UniProtKB/Swiss-Prot annotation, chain B:
Prevents the cell division inhibition by proteins MinC and MinD at internal division sites while permitting inhibition at polar sites. This ensures cell division at the proper site by restricting the formation of a division septum at the midpoint of the long axis of the cell. It comes from the Bacteria. Coiled coil: none annotated. Transmembrane segments: none annotated. Keywords: Cell cycle, Cell division. This is Cell division topological specificity factor. The gene is minE. InterPro entries: MinE (IPR005527), MinE_sf (IPR036707). One of its GO terms (biological process) is cell division. It holds the Pfam family MinE. Belongs to the MinE family.
Length: 277, 85
């Protein structure tokens, strides 16, 4: 990690995008859960102060007592604010404050919390708010790696490129002249049928434009909404393509080789095609 | 896709390829500006104001670009003057 002095093994991963609504929180929840499932002690921090939602996606909204800002302001200890996930061992959530705004986050405050977490956790996932303003910059400042969540759509790709510029210039690693943040592209809401029809940017189109290594492609899937309705990270839905694609992405993040899948159009029956179903 | 779609002409470029072309241009443009110093837009405006004291030009007639190579930075200033009558 790129915090001050002491060397710990904790890896800080920011999940970011610039654009809103592309699946940052869904991806943070899925990937954090996936890493914990592999036996690594993991915490997911919601940096979206004022608009907290990670708690809902993780299904722990009724267990929030203290939050990230309370810990920064020393109104609560870290162990009081951390919520232990009920389904997955080794997984904790640090919720965002709902009553403050992004100004409640300070570099020193965030650094203090991350340093304390790094003593105890192997992976720290920072779920960034949308935008390129203070909240997003705080979420990425201390990161060792970044997962850039992108939809195959013009405004999302452009915003992802903006956020890559910020990762390369305004992070602590950049300011200290250290090895740059590891960048990973996660393409979400991918619709192979529309790509085949030339109606949607393909994986290779987006890779050509952003020029960063591909971590995974998550197909558009009904399972994502179903999972968020129920407050269960979609990665636990092992019957769904989206869940399996997230698990593949986690495996790749851990350095394993996994071929891409779910990128082909599913063949429809002749009658269904004829009727336009 | 229903049966009638099969009769549609496929000659126009796909919207995805249009999207890719547009993105490649705008992203390249924005990347080239990324490493420019913050004072550049203001300096550009002041240069335009000075030139305008003498020649009637529009904002788009002045292009300013800063290129960094390994050992030096080159400030390129391109002014399109109006045709003389």
């Amino acid at each position: 990690m790129s915090l001050s002095g002491d060397t710990t093994l904790a890896k800080i991963i920011v999940v970011t995008s610039g654009k809103g609504g592309v699946g940052k929180t869904t991806s943070s929840a899925a990937i954090g859960t996936g890493i914990a499932l592999k036996g690594h002690k993991t915490v997911i921090i919601d940096f979206d102060v004022g608009l907290r939602n990670l708690d809902l996606i993780m299904g722990c909204e009724r267990r929030v007592v203290y939050d990230f800002v309370n810990v920064i302001n020393k109104e609560a200890t870290l162990s009081q604010a951390l919520i232990k996930d009920k389904r997955t061992k080794d997984l904790f959530i640090l919720p965002a404050s709902q009553t403050r705004d992004k100004d409640a986050l300070t570099i020193e405050g965030v650094q203090g919390v991350l340093e304390e977490l790094a003593k105890d956790f192997e992976y720290i996932i920072c779920d960034s708010p949308a935008g390129i303003e203070k909240g997003a910059q705080m979420a990425l400042y201390f990161a060792d790696a970044a997962i850039v969540v992108t939809n195959p759509e013009v405004s999302s790709v452009r915003d992802s490129d903006r956020i890559l510029g910020i990762l390369q210039s305004k992070s602590k690693r950049a300011e200290d002249g250290k090895e740059p943040i590891e960048e990973h592209l996660l393409l979400t809401r991918y619709h192979p049928g529309r790509v085949a029809l030339g109606e949607m940017l393909s994986v290779s189109d987006v890779e050509d434009i952003l020029a960063i290594p591909l971590l995974g492609v998550i197909p558009e899937s009904e399972a994502v909404l179903k999972a968020s309705n129920q407050g269960t990270p979609v990665i636990l839905d092992t019957d769904s393509e989206a869940g399996l694609a997230y698990m593949d992405a986690v495996d790749r993040l851990m350095g394993e080789e996994r071929p891409l899948r779910f990128l082909e159009v599913q063949k429809k029956g002749f009658i269904k095609r004829l009727l336009g179903g | 896709m229903g049966i009638f779609d099969y009769f549609k002409s496929k000659s126009a470029p796909s919207s995805a390829s249009v999207a890719k072309d547009r993105l490649q241009i705008i992203v390249a443009h924005e990347r080239s500006k990324r490493h420019q110093p913050d004072y550049l837009p203001q300096m550009q405006q002041e240069i335009i104001d000075v030139i305008r004291k003498y020649v009637n030009i529009g904002n788009e007639d002045v292009q300013i670009q800063l290129d960094n190579t390994d050992d030096c930075s080159i400030l390129e200033l391109n002014v399109t003057l109006p045709e003389q009558n």
